[in-house]
Amino acid sequence: MLKKAMNIADYDPELFKAIEDETCRQEEHIELIASENYTSPRVMEAQGSQLTNKYAEGYPGKRYYGGCEYVDVVETLAIERAKELFGATYANVQPHSGSQANSAVFMALLQPGDTVLGMNLAHGGHLTHGSPVNFSGKLYNIIPYGIDEAGKIDYDEMERLAIEHKPKMIIGGFSAFSGIVDWARMREIADKIGAYLFVDMAHVAGLIAAGVYPTPVPHAHVVTSTTHKTLAGPRGGIIISAADDEVLYKKLNSAVFPGGQGGPLMHVIAGKAVAFKEALEPEFKVYQQQVVKNAKAMVEVFLARGYKIVSGGTENHLMLVDLIGRDLTGKEADAALGSANITVNKNSVPNDPRSPFVTSGIRIGSPAITRRGFKEAEAKELTGWICDILDDATNTVVTDRVKGQVLALCARFPVYG
């Protein structure tokens, strides 16, 4: 017999301890992984609701199960809010992840073996943009493009590759690129060869929603995103479009269900609906503006301390610190900073001589610290501490000192006050 009083703490203390330990870790560590963020208690409330009990294969008004009248309301709210947020005429909120959203686009628009032009993972792309270890690289003929010596996307080279290889689809978007993408130029290239332009905006979706980063939606045939990262919602994916092409929309829907998924996660879709409503509020724009201000402030300190930033700066929420030529690997930097309660991730940089398991760089992002309330002053102070550790990564005196400073700063800015 189920009772509302049932709880994890009494029933499963081992699991409860792990959950509590993770809560403590998040409160006492500074999160700088560019793809991570803190979602709101309202989103978590939706995800913990009884919507988790409901199967709802199909789409609103066209389900394969009965009893879907209320989950139809939930999904419709999420769809309409996503369309409003991004200026789209189509939205599918069912993908369980960004990768599954991307997979659906490949399935809807391509045949196995088709040629695709995508950003090289080593230059800032994503696994699902054509990495040999991913489905995208295994099933399709991938032609990679990258960035030039200045860290910018070379659109002339992209156009040359497109004309030479005639891909059926060009992918825009990134996981470790700190510049502005010229979506209109990419659409021109795609149109020149009759290709689809598909944009994965996962990393900058929140910035785009707030109008602080150029939107790809008017230019791309189809756009995907995760709903966490800068959007600060639940972990999941979405597909949107403003192509006004009902045939395309039908293909995309079919590629999600039944093509790649069965029942949607209605509790997560409810969380997405909440997050989209939050992203439509005026304070969300203020937050995203601060995300970029904090990232720029951090870059300023890194450059002043003699560290190289790929692309020379940032126009979004992230930066890639290039450690080539230093007696420190990305893996070592990641571990040293972790010892001081600063969480980053090792990351390959262009022309990296080291393996992806070691790397010569670290990726840093400002969404989570901004969510805690950090402004430029705290971002600069924190970056100074990071540089102190990177300057002398094996010095435990420095690490211990920085850890104490981090704990004090975290206490001033709790995740959930």
From Swiss-Prot:
GO terms for molecular function: glycine hydroxymethyltransferase activity; pyridoxal phosphate binding. It holds the Pfam family SHMT. It catalyses: (6R)-5,10-methylene-5,6,7,8-tetrahydrofolate + glycine + H2O = (6S)-5,6,7,8-tetrahydrofolate + L-serine. (6S)-5,6,7,8-tetrahydrofolate binds at L121, G125, H126, L127, S355, P356, F357. Its cofactor is pyridoxal 5'-phosphate. It comes from the Bacteria. Belongs to the SHMT family. Catalyzes the reversible interconversion of serine and glycine with tetrahydrofolate (THF) serving as the one-carbon carrier. This reaction serves as the major source of one-carbon groups required for the biosynthesis of purines, thymidylate, methionine, and other important biomolecules. Also exhibits THF-independent aldolase activity toward beta-hydroxyamino acids, producing glycine and aldehydes, via a retro-aldol mechanism. Homodimer. This is Serine hydroxymethyltransferase. The lineage of its organism: Bacteria, Pseudomonadati, Pseudomonadota, Gammaproteobacteria, Alteromonadales.
